[in-house]
Regions:
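Rieske [2Fe-2S] iron-sulfur-binding domain
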Residues: 1-71, 78, 82-85
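C-terminal catalytic domain of Rieske-type non-heme iron oxygenases
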Residues: 56-234
Length: 234
């Protein structure tokens, strides 16, 4: 997942590649001599230049690496557009992030459902009762959904109430009861908001970048999601 290498080696057949993707070594390329006879090996017209790794168009911004198979695609900045780029730069502004862990899920459904889920502001206050009970995301939050000019990407922005406290009972704003009326935390300070200069207001920004990337900033935590379809034609 990370590290520093001077070359890339396929563990299966030990083909080695330079960091620019060019093939630089093939074991037994000339075959193996046995009993005066050469067995195996690559054909005489084998040219390493024709067997390099697939080259990608790469862009790096704020320490985040993006890659595309389409070398004619517009720049990353133009692809995001100024509206979404503003929230991306707010999140990835060069400060050091600490990776706390990884989570992988296999979902039997259309890959677009994950993108739609992040854009939907109605379900958090109805489905996620923990959010409702402790005022993390409720219908009375100040929220808005912003999109790029081509409606490919979106940022759902939400700000908790005054001083980060929810007012009124959960059922007052959700029209549903919390999962457990007496639910409480042993240490309420777990939910305290510790403002950081880069926030500039929102306590949660959920970004979707079409077609397969999601960035979620919720209070002081950040999570990224990468959708990887595995169906026919993926």
């Amino acid at each position: 997942r990370h590290g520093n290498r001077k070359e890339l080696v396929c563990p299966y057949h030990q083909w080695s590649y330079a960091l620019d993707g060019k093939l630089q070594g093939v074991p037994f390329r000339r075959g193996v001599r046995q009993d005066g006879k050469v067995n195996g090996g690559m054909p005489a017209d084998f040219d390493p230049k024709d067997h390099g790794l697939t080259r990608l168009k790469v862009a790096i911004r704020g320490g985040v690496v993006f890659a595309s198979f389409d070398h004619q695609i517009e720049s990353l900045e133009d692809y995001m557009g100024p509206v979404i780029l503003k929230y991306f730069d707010r999140l990835f502004n060069g400060r050091q992030l600490k990776i706390l862990g990884y989570n992988r899920q296999r979902i039997p459904g259309n890959w677009k459902l994950m993108q739609e889920n992040i854009k939907d502001p109605y379900h958090p206050g109805l489905l996620h009762t923990w959010f409702v009970t402790f005022g993390l995301w409720r219908a009375d939050n100040k929220s808005e959904l912003r999109m790029d000019d081509k409606h490919r990407h979106a940022a759902m922005i939400s700000t908790r109430g005054a001083a980060g406290q929810a007012t009124g009972g959960a059922s007052d704003v959700t029209q549903v009861s919390s999962f457990k009326a007496s639910m409480e935390l042993n240490d309420p300070s777990f939910l305290d908001i510790v403002p950081e200069p880069w926030w500039g207001g929102p306590t949660a920004v959920m970004m979707t970048l079409f077609p397969s990337v999601i960035f979620q900033q919720q209070v002081n935590s950040v999570s990224t999601r990468h959708i990887q379809p595995d169906g026919h034609g993926a």
